[in-house]
Each structure stands twice: as C-alpha cells, then as structure tokens.
Amino acid sequence: MTSPRKTHPLAKIINESFIDLPTPSNISSWWNFGSLLGTCLIIQITTGLFLAMHYTPDTSTAFSSVAHITRDVNYGWMIRYMHANGASMFFVCLFLHIGRGLYYGSFLFLKTWNIGTILLLTTMATAFMGYVLPWGQMSFWGATVITNLLSAIPYIGSDLVQWIWGGFSVDKATLTRFFTFHFISPFIIAALATIHLLFLHETGSSNPSGMTSDPDKITFHPYYTAKDILGLIFLLLALMSLTLFMPDLLTDPDNYTLANPLNTPPHIKPEWYFLFAYAILRSIPNKLGGVLALVLSILILMVIPMLHLSKQQSMMFRPITQTLFWTLAADLLTLTWIGGQPVEYPFVTIGQTASIMYFFIIVTLMPLSASIENKLLKW
C-alpha cells in the first residue's frame, strides 16, 4: 500500500517539497540559506505577534509602550531583542543567499530570481517600517528623510509624500499606517516565498559545478534536512548570543531618546543593512539622481541574467570573474562602512568611488571578463 504521505492531497505537497524532493548530491552549505530565511521569517512573525499585543501605534504612547514591553512584560526584553536582532540575522542570510545566487549562476532561473528580487524589496520595506515603530529620534528622522526622497519624483512627488505621511509631516497617521503595513507585510513575504519555492521546484536547484545534476540526485530528507538543522543551530546560536549578550550592538543609541521634531540628530542613518544603499544615495549630489541610483542599486539584480555572457553557469571554474565577485563583495562592505560615516572628506570621495565601482563591476567588468574567459576556453 502506498504511504499516505504520497497520496494525501496536503501531505503530498509537503512530501514533494521537503521530503522526497530530488536534490543534487553535491550542493554545499551555501544552499542552507533558503531554509534559514524561512526560519528567520517564522521567528519574526512569532516575536512580532507577541510584541503587537503590547505595542500601541500612537505618537504619545508608542515609545513608552516599547519601554513597558522591555520592563514589565514577561520575557518582553527577550522577545523585543530577538525581533530586532532577528531582522539583522534575516538580512545577513538574505545577502549571503543573493551572493550565492550570483556566484553559482542561480539567476539563470529567471522566474525564481525575479520573485527573489521582489522578496528583497518587500523585506527592505518591511524592515524600514518596523524601524519607525519604536518612535525614537532615529525612527522619526529616518522616516522623515527616507519618505521625503519620494518628493524627488517629478510632478507628483510632494503630493505622494503627503499622501504617505497622511498629513504635512511624519505624525500619528504615519505611525498608524506604518504599523498596519508592518504587521501585514510578513504574511505577504510568506506568500511570495511560497511562490519563490514553487518556481524553484519547477527547475530544481542548481549546484556548485553549474552542470546538470539530473543523473545524480538524492532525496531531500534525511540528507539535507540534517544538513539544514546544522545551519539552523549556528543561526540560533548567533541570534541568541546577540540577544542575550549584546542586544544593542547593532542599534542606534539615538533611538533611546523620544522622537522630537524640533531636534535633529547630528547624523541621521538607517539600520546597518541599508547603509550600502544609503551610501550610494548620498554619493550623488542631485536628489533625483541619488534616488534613481538607490533604486537601481537593488533593481540591477533583475538585469544580471541579461549581462551573463559566459558559457558556464557557475563561477567555480572562472578565476577572473571570481576576483571581480570578491572585489564587489569588498566594495559592498566599503559602502556599508561609508553609509555610517558623517558627510565629510574623505568619506564622500570614498563613497563616490565605491558607488561607481559597484555599477562598473556589475555592468561592464563582469560581462567583459565572461567574454575573455569564453575566448580562453578555445585555447
């Protein structure tokens, strides 16, 4: 008799996605990040749900409600810091997941890749709105500065900003709607992640060699479930170490001061995971140009499949492109550092150079190195 696991309508879907899924036998730990991202999402939804039970989205009580959660709610401090640092872990996994996709040519699965890019944008929007909710100084001014960027859009810009604010400045209406969207967004992310998985299972996973793995597949369970659990242990170890020993390591001290529209912080900056894009935005003196560069720094991911000229999918056997890839990684780290520095010499010059390098490597140098490597194959 066939197992109900393979015949029951619901169990069958789970079975084909996580148990009997044919998986390449040679995928490395770089393929762990998909399941880790799923875990991060579950952690964020769970902790967020408990935080929402005690949080009040009102300008007069938001800040004190967060203090109340931290001080008076049972394990409220832990839930709050797990949520805040969970977002950081989420983005670490996201960036590594995208990096793996770039390195091993996973972007050639167009549908999966494009849904993934939309997922990245949605996650960034969700994290930004979440950063506004504690209603500290950096929350308020971050919201003001970032939403104000939309005013650079010709004709409709200023109307659009006021529409998002729900008034003439970031105020009660803004906080309420940000809380509403921040609450619903993770469920949209979960739906998009399901579609992402659906498209991935249409083609199957890539593998480090970049060659077809059809003749050599193994079942996902028990091999990769065990491997994923190891990654999960490391993720939880990192998250709980941050939460229990250094909960404020990645947060801004300014956010422990109540939002004050009359007092601007000396240096407005977003959370660390947005700093690379923020540095690109600041490196262009023109407002509209900066906003375009900011948007393109993310949307360029959708163009990468069209810039792929190599005859090989993976970078595993392409030393020139490998060098460029790691230069790009170093460039992104430089941009992240610059985004957290004040707007003065030499940081401005370094930021402008790193921003030019970012686009130049992706748009020009990588396709060029692919062409050179194609020619070298004929030797």
Swiss-Prot record:
The chain crosses the membrane at residues 33-53, 77-98, 113-133, 178-198, 226-246, 288-308, 320-340, 347-367. InterPro entries: Cyt_b/b6_C, Cyt_b/b6_C_sf, Cyt_b/b6_N, Cytb/b6-like_sf, Cytochrome_b, Cytochrome_b_C_euk/bac, Cytochrome_b_N_euk/bac, Di-haem_cyt_TM. It comes from the Eukaryota. The keyword Membrane applies. Binds 2 heme b groups non-covalently. Heme b b566 binds at residues 97, 196. Its cofactor is heme b. It is a multi-pass membrane protein. One of its GO terms (biological process) is mitochondrial electron transport, ubiquinol to cytochrome c. Heme b b562 binds at residues 83, 182. The keyword Mitochondrion applies. Keywords: Electron transport, Heme, Iron, Membrane, Metal-binding, Mitochondrion, Mitochondrion inner membrane, Respiratory chain, Transmembrane, Transmembrane helix, Transport, Ubiquinone. A ubiquinone binds at residue 201. GO terms for cellular component: mitochondrial inner membrane; respiratory chain complex III. GO terms for molecular function: metal ion binding; ubiquinol-cytochrome-c reductase activity. It holds the Pfam family Cytochrom_B_C. It is found in: Mitochondrion inner membrane. Belongs to the cytochrome b family. The cytochrome bc1 complex contains 11 subunits: 3 respiratory subunits (MT-CYB, CYC1 and UQCRFS1), 2 core proteins (UQCRC1 and UQCRC2) and 6 low-molecular weight proteins (UQCRH/QCR6, UQCRB/QCR7, UQCRQ/QCR8, UQCR10/QCR9, UQCR11/QCR10 and a cleavage product of UQCRFS1). This cytochrome bc1 complex then forms a dimer. Component of the ubiquinol-cytochrome c reductase complex (complex III or cytochrome b-c1 complex) that is part of the mitochondrial respiratory chain. The b-c1 complex mediates electron transfer from ubiquinol to cytochrome c. Contributes to the generation of a proton gradient across the mitochondrial membrane that is then used for ATP synthesis. Heme 1 (or BL or b562) is low-potential and absorbs at about 562 nm, and heme 2 (or BH or b566) is high-potential and absorbs at about 566 nm. This is Cytochrome b. It comes from Aotus trivirgatus.
